[in-house]
Amino acid sequence: MINDGGAKPETLLRVAEIGGRGRSLVAAQSLRAGQVILRESPLLLYSAFPFLSSSVSPYCDHCFRLLASSAHQKCQSCSLVSFCSPNCFASHTPWLCESLRRLHQSSSSAFSDQPSDRQVQARFLLSAYNLAAASPSDFQILLSLQGSGSSNGDPSCSAGDSAAAGFLHSLLSSVCPSLPVSISPDLTAALLSKDKVNAFGLMEPCSVSNEKRSVRAYGIYPKTSFFNHDCLPNACRFDYVDSASDGNTDIIIRMIHDVPEGREVCLSYFPVNMNYSSRQKRLLEDYGFKCDCDRCKVEFSWSEGEEDENEIMEEMEDQDEQEEMEDSVGENEEEVCGNGVDDESNFPHAYFFVRYMCEKENCFGTLAPLPPKTHDASRVLECNVCGSVKEDEVGVNQ
C-alpha cells in the first residue's frame, strides 16, 4: 500500500542538535498519524548472502525481488549474479563483474577461517568501491555518514572491526581490478563502520512457519539514517520489495501517531518486542550507545530489570485484562510513546503494545495507520512486517 502522500521531507522535518542524542530529526510542523514523512531510494544495495552460501539467492541482484523460476537473466561472465530484467542487468558494471569473479575464485581459501559475515562485508565493500567509480558525488554522500572506523573516536568500532577491515582491505586490494579512485586501509575501515551503523536490512517475505526471518539485502539510505532510535518509536519504516511498481527498494517512513511541532521523530532499530537486556546489548554492540529512553528507564527500575515482554504480551491476550489496560493507559497516548513516563504505572508502554504491535504469530511487526486521505486519520492499521491490515479497534473505542 504505497502512498507517498506528497511528502516533502524538507518541510516536514528539520535537523536539530539534542543534548545527549546528537544530531536528530524533529517535526518542523505538526505531523499526523499515518502521514508519510519520507520516501527514500537507496544509495547502494548489496546481497546478504555469503559467497560460499549453500543456497543460491532466489532474488534479483539489483532490485532484490523474488526471481521468477523461468524468466531471469544470469551473468554469463561471472555466473554469480542473476537479474529479473534487462534494466536490472544493466546495473552490473564490468568492474564489479570481474571483482566478483576473482573474489569467488579465491573465496574458499581466503574465507576459510573467517565468519560468514566477513563475506557479506566484502559484498558491501565491492558495492561501495563500485559507487566510488560510478558516481563520485554519491560516494561523497556515503562518506558523510556517521562512522569513522577509528577505535579512538568511534564508539561502535571494536578491535574485531579493525581486524576485519585489515583483512578485507588486504584481500580486495590484491584480488580486485584497479579502480580510478584510491582506496586506503583507513578508508576501508571507515566504510565498514558506516555500513555497520547506517545499513538497513530488507527482509525476506514474512511466513508464519519462519519465526526468525533472514535479511535478503542491505541498503544505505542517507536521509533515513538521520533518525535516532527509541524503544517506543513514533514512526516506523515500510518497504514493499516484492511489489511490481518502480521504487520497490525505497524506504517509506510513516508516523505511528500524531506528533506536535518540535518533537523528535524516532524509529526503533529492531522489533519493539525485544526485552530490556537484549535491546541494550544490541544497541551497545552494533551502534555504540546505551539507551536511556523513557521505556528503558522504567524497565531498568523493575526488580529484575529483564522482564520478558513476550510473556507480558501473551498475558494481555486475555480480553478482560486488555480492556482494563486500555482504560487505564489509553487516555493520553503521547505519555507512552516515547514522550514521557507515567510514574504511577508499572508498565506505562502497555498501550503501545495493545494498539501498535502486530498480533499475528511470529510477526513482531509495528502497526501504523494508512496514509490519511482526508482531514481525519485512517482507522485502518498496516503492519510494517507482514503487511496485514486491521481496524484500529483501540482508537475507535477512545
Curated annotation (Swiss-Prot):
This enzyme's EC code(s): 2.1.1.-
Name assigned to this protein: Histone-lysine N-methyltransferase ASHR2
Cellular location(s): Nucleus; Chromosome
Gene Ontology molecular function: any one: histone methyltransferase activity
PROSITE patterns attached to this UniProt entry: SET
Enzyme class: transferase
Keywords (A to Z) from UniProt: Chromatin regulator, Chromosome, Methyltransferase, Nucleus, S-adenosyl-L-methionine, Transferase
Domain of life: Eukaryota
Domain spans labelled SET: 11-270
Cited SUPFAM superfamilies: SET domain (SSF82199)
Family: Belongs to the class V-like SAM-binding methyltransferase superfamily. Histone-lysine methyltransferase family. SET2 subfamily.
GO cellular component, one term: nucleus
UniProt KW Methyltransferase keyword: yes
Function: Histone methyltransferase.
A Pfam family it matches: SET
Species of provenance: Arabidopsis thaliana (Mouse-ear cress)
BP term (GO), one: methylation
InterPro entries: ASHR2-like, SET_dom, SET_dom_sf
Reactions listed under catalytic activity: L-lysyl-[histone] + S-adenosyl-L-methionine = N(6)-methyl-L-lysyl-[histone] + S-adenosyl-L-homocysteine + H(+)
